[in-house]
Amino acid sequence: KTRGAARFVQDNPANAIYIRCTPVGGTLTAMLRQLGTALKLPATRNRLELSMAIHDRLKGTDKVIIIDEAQNLRFDALEELRSLSDPDDLTGESGTGICLIGNSEVYSRMLGKQEAQFAQQFSRVRFRRRYSTADVKLADVEKLFPTLADGSHGKELAFMTGVCRSKWGIRGAMSVYTNAVRNENTSLDGLRGIAASMGVGVLS
């Protein structure tokens, strides 16, 4: 997820804003400050002024805001992001695109499995799509690990696909492979050994 977001930002530097939300950065104030910094706005301690400045700066642009680790966002921060995506009441002009990247917690919260307020908020999102590591395909894994996609590493690719689809996801798979490379053994046994030492399981 993070690698995909980073690639999108690299390919679209003028139109993409990337923010990583840490556990202490999920408050409305922290989120506004990160957005303000990304948009090169003057620093201010007044949240209303900063919010208005962000809205003004984004108005009429074709930017997309990508929030990584979005499960750390508080409700009021999510509500502020939703307001950025709303169309202009007077002109009908489209709002800013918002992409939330996180674990299944943020999706469950937005669906209302934990809090009704998130369900109400989620129902106002007009275009929603969920992507999960369980949807990772062999073709995706071949692109992530091209050295294994030479036609002679089918078992290794299948193993890495299982890691990608597990709760450790693509990030866990990347860690397993990186450590296997450092260990100079990317064979199936080498990958399995590294995964076992890291406590990483696999979905078959």
Say what each PLM segment does:
Residues Q10-V24:
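Conserved catalytic segments around the Walker B and adjacent sensor/switch elements
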Residues A16-Y18, T27-R45:
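Conserved NTP-binding/hydrolysis module of P-loop NTPases
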Residues R57-A77, L81, D88:
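Conserved P-loop NTPase "ATPase switch" module shared by AAA+ and STAND
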Residues L73, D86-F118:
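Sensor-1/coupling segment of RecA-like P-loop NTPase cores
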Residues A6-Q10, A119-S123, F127, S132-S204:
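C-terminal alpha-helical "lid" subdomain
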Residues T44-K63:
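Conserved alpha-helical scaffold flanking the Walker A/P-loop in AAA+ ATPase domains
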Residues P23-G26, N72, G102-S108, D135-L138:
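Conserved nucleotide-binding/hydrolysis micro-motifs of P-loop NTPases
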Residues K1-F8, V24:
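Walker A/P-loop nucleotide-binding motif
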